């Protein structure tokens, strides 16, 4: 008899965490949700009004302004860009949705950069 021990899939655990978090927070027109998605190569941020189901501002490593540097440096630039675009549309306060990721590394760098550039959360 062979016993197989399977390791849990990290992304499935993250998605489970994210669903649990999303049940507790929602973005409105007054205070939209700043959502983060992190892949192996890039990081994506969106400011979302969940009531209307509309993305109000977004930035990612696919943007032309973000091209060089380490992944953490790119996350800092993405945080700056999404904050500037949100402030330009009159958004100053957001609800931070870390997407089930730990508040560490690239996620923390993006959040700190967004705070420094005018978003409050």
UniProtKB/Swiss-Prot annotation:
<dbReference type="GO" id="GO:0022625">
    <property type="term" value="C:cytosolic large ribosomal subunit"/>
</dbReference>
<dbReference type="InterPro" id="IPR004389">
    <property type="entry name" value="Ribosomal_uL18_bac-type"/>
</dbReference>
<protein>
    <recommendedName>
        <fullName>Large ribosomal subunit protein uL18</fullName>
    </recommendedName>
</protein>
<dbReference type="GO" id="GO:0003735">
    <property type="term" value="F:structural constituent of ribosome"/>
</dbReference>
<comment type="function">
    <text>This is one of the proteins that bind and probably mediate the attachment of the 5S RNA into the large ribosomal subunit, where it forms part of the central protuberance.</text>
</comment>
<keyword id="KW-0694">RNA-binding</keyword>
<dbReference type="GO" id="GO:0008097">
    <property type="term" value="F:5S rRNA binding"/>
</dbReference>
<comment type="subunit">
    <text>Part of the 50S ribosomal subunit; part of the 5S rRNA/L5/L18/L25 subcomplex. Contacts the 5S and 23S rRNAs.</text>
</comment>
<dbReference type="Pfam" id="PF00861">
    <property type="entry name" value="Ribosomal_L18p"/>
</dbReference>
<keyword id="KW-0699">rRNA-binding</keyword>
<dbReference type="GO" id="GO:0006412">
    <property type="term" value="P:translation"/>
</dbReference>
<keyword id="KW-0687">Ribonucleoprotein</keyword>
<comment type="similarity">
    <text>Belongs to the universal ribosomal protein uL18 family.</text>
</comment>
<keyword id="KW-0689">Ribosomal protein</keyword>
<dbReference type="InterPro" id="IPR005484">
    <property type="entry name" value="Ribosomal_uL18_bac/euk"/>
</dbReference>
């Amino acid at each position: 008899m062979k016993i197989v021990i399977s390791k849990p899939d990290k992304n499935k655990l993250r998605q489970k965490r994210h669903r649990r978090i999303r049940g507790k927070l929602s973005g409105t027109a007054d205070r939209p949700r700043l959502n983060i998605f992190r892949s192996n190569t890039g990081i994506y941020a969106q400011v979302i009004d969940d009531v209307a189901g509309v993305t109000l501002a977004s930035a990612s490593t696919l943007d032309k302004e973000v091209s060089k540097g380490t992944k953490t440096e790119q996350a800092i630039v993405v945080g700056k860009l999404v904050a500037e675009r949100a402030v330009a549309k009159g958004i100053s306060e957001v609800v931070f949705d870390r997407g089930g990721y730990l508040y560490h590394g690239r996620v923390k760098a993006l959040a700190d950069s967004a705070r420094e550039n005018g978003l409050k959360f």
